[in-house]
Amino acid sequence: ASIERLTRVLEIAVAQAAPDLVPAASFGTVSNFTIGGFDPVRGKRYIMFRFSGGGYGGHPISDGLTNGCGAISMARTSSIEVQEQLYPVRFEYYRMKQGSAGAGKNRGGFGTEYLVRLTAGEGVGSVMGDRGVFGPYGLHDGHEGGKAEVEFHRDGERFVPRHITKEEVIPLKAGDAVRIASPGGGGWGNPLERDVEAVRKDVERELLGADEARTIYGVVLDRNEQGRLVVDAARADAPSVSGRVGQLIGVARREGRQGADAPVAEAEVLAVPVED
């Protein structure tokens, strides 16, 4: 992880001189997980190792990459299907982690989360990661990305490591599980300047909550008669939406755009065409 931190420090330094060339921080850790023991089904001892991808930082021209590989080696982990065939484990889910992307004009990529359950025998588990306290930083008013998370589920109880993302030799038996979530990337630019349709799509895909869309991005959403998720222009007096309009008009003024004071600006911000 030291090389990741060094890289981020250098990027921050370069961002002072060339703000439009440097992305926000990536997830910066691979959230290593190891489990070992005796497999009574296959009749042999085993050690399973897994690391996670995470979100890259948003950058000047687009959102960050979701579930990107570790930047140190660019290595890829084994597929969960292969590991289920080789070891006494079952992955109950492996998915993008909702809300983990740092908000921004160009948001960070999403981190991942998975829950793996021991299906037979006994073993010991260990985790080694980072970013459990501070998420990947954002740039130019972008928000911090989501943090790493680790949970052990043993005997029906939830256990979080004392050092959040670091623990070793945790006894596990059949039925116990471990949940590991990787960080999302930091956001780039002010979230209030994000394209409204991009916000709507993230909510539609259940990657962002409707409340976060309203309070962070200033986008109010509702369902139309066909059940499609659309921007609710009738609620344009909501404080968050008014703030978004004011922010965007301010940006237009700073950039010297024509018609920045025109009342049509609010309609332009809120209008999203409804797809058939």
Regions found by a protein language model. Give the residues of each.
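Glycine/proline-enriched, intrinsically flexible loops and inter-domain linkers
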Residues: 1-261, 265-267
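Acidic, low-complexity intrinsically disordered tails
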Residues: 272-276
